[in-house]
Amino acid sequence: MDNKYKGTKTELNLQAAFAGESQARNKYTYFASKAKKEGFEQIAALFLKTADNEKEHAKMWFKELNGIGNTAENLSAAADGENYEWTDMYEEFAKTAEEEGFTELAVKFRAVGAIEKHHEERYRALLKNLETSQVFEKSTVKVWECRNCGHIVVGTKAPDVCPVCNHPQSYFEISEENY
């Protein structure tokens, strides 16, 4: 993922634009939720519409920075980002919070850091599956479920096409029953 703006002020501007639009999108979704809870459906809908616009603005700047690669590159970048968050960022935030007497916040920072570690592990496992061609084929029998229609297939490989709804193999995942 080559970035033609590397080392320029324009790169910093693009990064700031991406960060600003991303934060605005999240804030507007939170504001929409609050407006909805307070009984203001139209206002909630406008916040969500604007949030969708901000998402597209952020995507535009992120693409300009060549931040979106192929799935393997994206999984690797995501894992690296999660690693930074749990090994450096949240631990430093927790230490600072403790030094400043905010012990409850330090506990929250560390708890979120533990979640980020899980995110990293999940992305790395998915990347390994992708690199070893084990996304839709396993060495042991699994229960595969079509994400579109719910059709169940038992075997080592998801079908190329769902025999019920004709959606492609990409719609199959290993079925989890955690209830």
Regions found by a protein language model. Give the residues of each.
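Non-heme di-metal
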Residues: 1-179
